[in-house]
């Protein structure tokens, strides 16, 4: 069963020039978001730009959050990443979805009208309460070993 999430169209080109975000295959986890811009953007090396997707969403379910993720091809082929690496959309946010993109390459990158620039997925949300303790009851094998504790190979 699919959950319903309200979407509000902010750009009148949807349905004419652009499609609503959609799953491309039955196994797709994410839906692509498009650059709803009025003119092409030349993203210079080491430059960041904020781009409209042309939509607002209203998740309206406190058990679901949205995540904005990069498109792997943009990063691998062109060095274009999300400047905040992952964008979190809280269940009670109702504003426009904006994408902050960073060109980490040494070449200019052209963002055209309607380009697919990021993807959105929806995930279950678990809110927690902190339980303050003096020590952990069950000690794991890993304990407090972090950053690189398992080696390189």
Swiss-Prot record:
The keyword Transmembrane helix does not apply. InterPro entries: dUTPase, dUTPase-like, dUTPase-like_sf, dUTPase_trimeric. One of its GO terms (biological process) is dUMP biosynthetic process. SUPFAM superfamilies: dUTPase-like. Pathway: Pyrimidine metabolism; dUMP biosynthesis; dUMP from dCTP (dUTP route): step 2/2. It holds the Pfam family dUTPase. Transmembrane segments: none annotated. Its cofactor is Mg(2+). It catalyses: dUTP + H2O = dUMP + diphosphate + H(+). Keywords: Hydrolase, Magnesium, Metal-binding, Nucleotide metabolism. Substrate binds at residues 71-73, 84, 88-90, 98. GO terms for molecular function: dUTP diphosphatase activity; magnesium ion binding. Its EC number is 3.6.1.23. Belongs to the dUTPase family. This enzyme is involved in nucleotide metabolism: it produces dUMP, the immediate precursor of thymidine nucleotides and it decreases the intracellular concentration of dUTP so that uracil cannot be incorporated into DNA. This is Deoxyuridine 5'-triphosphate nucleotidohydrolase. It comes from Wigglesworthia glossinidia brevipalpis.
């Amino acid at each position: 069963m699919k959950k319903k999430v309200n979407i509000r169209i902010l750009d009148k080109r949807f349905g004419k020039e652009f499609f609503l975000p959609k799953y491309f295959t039955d196994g797709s986890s994410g839906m692509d978001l498009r650059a709803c811009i009025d003119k092409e953007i030349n993203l210079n090396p080491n430059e960041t730009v904020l781009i409209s997707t042309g939509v607002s969403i209203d998740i309206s379910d406190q058990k679901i959050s949205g995540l904005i993720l990069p498109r792997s091809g943009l990063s691998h082929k062109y060095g274009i990443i999300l400047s905040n690496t992952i964008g979190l959309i809280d269940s009670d946010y109702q504003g426009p979805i904006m994408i902050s993109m960073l060109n980490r390459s040494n070449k200019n990158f052209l963002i055209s009208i309607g380009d697919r620039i990021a993807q959105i997925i929806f995930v279950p949300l678990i809110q927690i309460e902190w339980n303050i303790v003096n020590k952990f009851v069950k000690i794991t094998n890993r304990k407090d070993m972090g950053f690189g504790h398992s080696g390189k190979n």
